[in-house]
């Protein structure tokens, strides 16, 4: 009942109100020219007016409530990702105190983390990371030797939008008389091998020319990012932690190598010839995958429209794609990244470092101002946990954007097991970038790849850890 829900509601351990004299709390957030009109742009910090759009209006009302309660003004400045790192450096080194909260893009942020530009969020007054409005997976993944320079929070839907998932075309699945895909997920049977089987069954060379073209129906529409997504779907990560809360490069166990080799078979299906009936299974693996990063003039929009126009059974995506796809005609469902094997405990969904940023607080904030910003962030996060996040998941993703109740259940699975791998964030020794090229290059010799990178990766982890420890001491 509603009363029980109210009783169970966790409240922030901060005063319910304060008077900061209409002081401005200014957020600096990365942007990307060309992305301004898409959902990849941050839409969760401020809203100018009530428009009738669910996320916008929830953000507007959230801010109004917190601004009234604490007598502050929440403001936003967007800056292109090509400029924001320099601006943050100048801000901190110049001690100008312009910005109170910063969101550089996650892919570009590690160099800033190592320069002592940001407070350890664990030490900011009034912020309680044990509360559910701070993402515990992000806290665990990003903290190194106790230092947490950035965090994912309920204030934002942007990092949820950056979560990997898979869409499937229901019409193609029905025409190919495939088994019920939702049931596979619910029964824990949605695996790499099952993806391969279904994709092979759905692939059609419509024009009969024997070659893969966008005129045909692919089993899986993807890009180079798929290799990262599939690997992390296995529940494994490149980087884990030791007893001192330090990063350790643990990628390369026998099971992990097997996982990657399977991923390669999937990613590389476009790049091989099919010559003989005796290689039917291999042929199917080779034929049904499209890597849009290796085909000329295929940007993200073109790639998405291929799926919307019925040219693929499966479509690798981030959740931000769902908002764009709802305008199309395709009857699609949403499912998590497949498991490596049925016995795996859960489905895991990677968060893309390329399309999100996480919250940091610059070390230029001190004393009363730091305490004020901590309180406002805690209040915003708590309020968002009960308003913005439910609105995002229940209304925007489930009701507005998904076409059926079953996709709604899948979204809970996707959101509840999100993976932040430190390797994807820090890219130690360029490993993450090189790994993403393995699929394109059809390199299945994973052991040699690891061996060639191990020394440099270990060296860069050590260097990064020392820099983060020094940054924590300074911050």
Predicted regions and their residues:
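Gram-positive cell-envelope targeting signals
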Residues: 1-13, 27, 66, 98-104, ...
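Short, well-ordered beta-strand elements
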Residues: 21-56, 72-77, 101, 218-220, ...
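Extracytoplasmic/periplasmic solute-binding protein
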Residues: 28-31, 96-102, 106, 143-164, ...
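Extracytoplasmic "Venus flytrap"/periplasmic binding protein-like
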Residues: 69-143, 176
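Short, solvent-exposed loop/beta-turn-alpha elements that line the ligand-binding surface or hinge
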Residues: 126-134, 185, 237-258, 342-349
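Glycine-centered hinge/linker elements that transmit conformational signals in sensory
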Residues: 196-200, 241-296
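Extracytoplasmic/periplasmic substrate-recognition and gating elements
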Residues: 326-395
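Conserved C-terminal helix/tail region of periplasmic/extracytoplasmic solute-binding proteins
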Residues: 363-374, 381-475
């Amino acid at each position: 009942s509603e009363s029980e829900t109210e009783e169970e509601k966790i409240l922030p351990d901060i005063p319910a109100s304060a008077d900061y004299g209409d002081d401005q709390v200014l957020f600096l957030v990365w942007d990307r020219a060309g992305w301004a009109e898409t959902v990849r742009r941050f839409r969760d910090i401020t809203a100018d007016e009530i428009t009738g759009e669910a996320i916008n209006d929830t953000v507007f009302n959230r801010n109004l409530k917190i601004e009234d309660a604490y007598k502050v003004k929440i403001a936003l400045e967007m800056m292109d990702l090509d400029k924001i790192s320099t601006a943050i450096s100048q801000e901190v080194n110049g001690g100008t105190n312009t910005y109170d909260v910063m969101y550089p893009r996650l892919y570009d942020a590690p160099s800033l983390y190592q320069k002592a530009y940001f407070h350890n969020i664990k030490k900011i007054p009034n912020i309680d990371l044990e509360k559910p409005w701070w993402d515990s997976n992000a806290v665990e993944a990003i903290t190194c030797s106790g230092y947490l320079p950035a965090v994912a929070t309920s204030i934002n839907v942007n990092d949820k939008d950056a979560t990997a998932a898979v869409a499937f075309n229901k019409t193609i699945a029905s025409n190919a008389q495939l088994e019920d895909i939702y049931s596979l997920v619910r029964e824990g049977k949605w695996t790499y091998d099952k993806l391969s089987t279904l994709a092979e069954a759905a692939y059609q060379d419509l024009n009969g020319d024997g070659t893969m073209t966008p005129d045909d129906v692919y089993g899986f529409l993807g890009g180079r990012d798929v290799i990262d997504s599939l690997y992390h779907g296995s529940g494994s990560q490149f980087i884990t932690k030791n007893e001192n809360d330090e990063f350790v490069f643990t990628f390369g166990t026998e099971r992990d190598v097997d996982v990657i080799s399977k991923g390669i078979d999937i990613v590389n299906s476009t790049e091989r010839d099919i010559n003989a009936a005796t290689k039917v299974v291999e042929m199917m693996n080779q034929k049904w995958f499209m890597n849009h990063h290796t085909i000329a003039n295929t940007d993200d929009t073109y790639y998405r429209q291929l799926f919307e126009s019925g040219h693929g059974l499966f479509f690798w995506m981030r959740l931000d794609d769902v908002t764009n796809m709802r305008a199309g005609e395709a009857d699609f469902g949403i499912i998590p990244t497949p498991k490596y094997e049925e016995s795996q405990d859960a489905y895991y969904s990677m968060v893309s470092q390329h399309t999100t940023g996480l919250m940091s607080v610059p070390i230029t904030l001190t004393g009363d101002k730091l305490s004020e910003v901590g309180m406002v962030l805690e209040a915003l996060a708590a309020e968002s946990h009960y308003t913005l996040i439910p609105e995002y998941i229940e209304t925007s993703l489930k009701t507005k954007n998904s076409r059926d109740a079953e996709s709604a259940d899948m979204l809970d699975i996707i959101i509840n097991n999100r993976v932040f791998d430190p390797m994807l964030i820090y890219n130690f020794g360029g490993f993450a970038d090189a790994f993403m090229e393995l699929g394109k290059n059809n390199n299945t010799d994973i052991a040699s790849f690891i061996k060639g990178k191990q020394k440099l990766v270990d060296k860069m982890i050590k260097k990064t850890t020392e820099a983060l420890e020094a940054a924590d001491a300074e911050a």
